[in-house]
Amino acid sequence: MASPLSPGSRILIGLVRAYQLVISPLLGPRCRFQPTCSHYAIEALSRFGMIKGSWLALKRVLKCHPLNPGGDDPVPPKPDDNREH
């Protein structure tokens, strides 16, 4: 069962979606990565929560510049919580 999103994660995802609907269409396609940085941010926030998801999204956005070749850069998998004790 998936854990529910924290209120902070929901707010940040809402802000990213607002960016996707309002600002991104005005700028046109600029992201050099797949998935796009905004989709990456939503997935990272959903998978890892507000703190780690924000950190991953920030690192991704900072990599998205003309000197980086881009390409496929998925959100890392969440470590398995079923460790042997």
Swiss-Prot record:
Lineage: superkingdom: Bacteria
Compartments where found: Cell inner membrane
Protein's organism: Serratia proteamaculans (strain 568)
Keyword Phosphoprotein: no
UniProtKB keywords: Cell inner membrane, Cell membrane, Membrane
GO cellular component, one term: plasma membrane
Protein's job: Could be involved in insertion of integral membrane proteins into the membrane.
Name this protein carries in UniProt: Putative membrane protein insertion efficiency factor
InterPro entries: Membr_insert_effic_factor_YidD
NCBIfam families: membrane protein insertion efficiency factor YidD
Membrane topology recorded in Swiss-Prot or TrEMBL: Peripheral membrane protein
Segments passing through the bilayer: none
